[in-house]
Amino acid sequence: MVEVGVSDIAIYVPPFYLSHEELAKARGVPKEKYIMGLGNQKMAVIPNWEDAVTMAANAAMQVLEKTRTDPEDIQQLVVSTESGVDHSKAVASFVQGLLKIGTRCRVYEVKHACYGGTAGLVDSIDRISRNGKTSRKGLVIMTDIAKYGFGNAGESTQGAGAVALLVEKNPRLCSIDTSLNGVFSKDVFDFWRPTGHRVPIVDGKFSIECYLMALEGSVSEFRSNLGLEQGKLLDHMDYIIYHMPFTNMARKAHRRLIEIECEGKDLETQEEIYNQTFSDKVAPGLMGVREVGNIYTGSVYMGLISLLENEREKAEGKRIGIFSYGSGCGAEFLLYNMQTDISGIINSLHFKEQLDKRKEITFEQYTQFYSKSSEEVFYYPDEANSFKNRYTKFVFTGFKDHKRQYI
């Protein structure tokens, strides 16, 4: 049986960030509320010349360039987002044009809150696996701007970014057997954004309850599909990456997993197992959410990139459990089987380099970015070109005849 999975991955984050220390000072709260309470340190801030389209294209261009992939070989282009720019025209269509992907390609957008990226990935893997041509590839992109009300309780968990994955047969990074996936879904209102609302409505406590309920449900099916007894799952995975709207959500999730897998053990033993497995299996994937914040659909895959950059060759040949959750709600637990030689892919990630090259902004500058929507700004081509750099290949310049313009 031919393996199908991910051959390469790339991330794009905006060039600005606001520190949580600066945000706490402006909001008149102790910095520990954000840094210790959430576990975060910074949040990405997107400028007016970027949006979900530019971030998606900028992440995807990295993948195409470093793998030397012919855009004509892309058979399926999926963009998952809850930050769409048009009620009808898909973000994926804009990206298709910017990347010059051919017409013999299935192009569409997926929406299911933060779970949408995994839904698009699983669908692409299944489609590529059914296609007889080994040259056919899928390009799956997650792109989002997590934006809450100015001064809202969720403001400190904001962020922005995009992740792109290249899907094909005989993958170079990891294989994924989707028949093993554990899924869970239920109709709930834990996080939603009604039509016409610029920011979401969040029932924070209930959303965490839904997340943990979905984790338990998807893990149960995943374990059953693997044929494992309860209590054996932790030994089957070298690392675990949870969906992380904020850093400490990974702690809540892992504690629940330990309670499930260590049922019957005394609390002291459970705590020992939690501390050891969190340090070894979960902590290596936390860098991105600490530095960037929540990027919705791409959050769990930013965790994968963080793990790869931190663990490097130690991740070769390992098994990584992935828990993807989206409000509303839908969830899936997957297993990534890493290939044994991925050093070249890891060396081409440059995530830490992107983070280091960002510019810190003041709270006043953050206020200006927040108050000006992209619909109110237009940049002439010469001015817009000045915003480009090694990672920012595409920028938004405004509207012409109600059509979004990019260069």
Give the positions of each predicted feature.
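Condensing-enzyme catalytic core mediating Claisen C-C bond formation in acyl metabolism
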Residues: M1-W49, N152-S220, E332-I407
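Short, well-ordered amphipathic alpha-helical segments that serve as non-catalytic structural scaffolds
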Residues: P30, V53-T67, V91, C210-G227, ...
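A conserved active-site cap/scaffold subdomain adjacent to cofactor or substrate pockets
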Residues: K205-L226, G231-E259, G288, G293
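Flexible, glycine-rich active-site loops centered on histidine and acidic residues
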Residues: S129-A164
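C-terminal catalytic subdomain
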Residues: G264-K265, S279-D356
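Conserved catalytic cysteine-centered active-site region
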Residues: K33-G37, Q41-V53, G84-K137, T143, ...
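Conserved beta-ketoacyl condensing-enzyme motif
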Residues: V6, A52-T118, E229-L257
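Acidic, glycine-rich active-site loops and adjacent beta-strand->loop/helix elements
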Residues: A10-Y12, S80-D86, H112-G117, M142-K147, ...
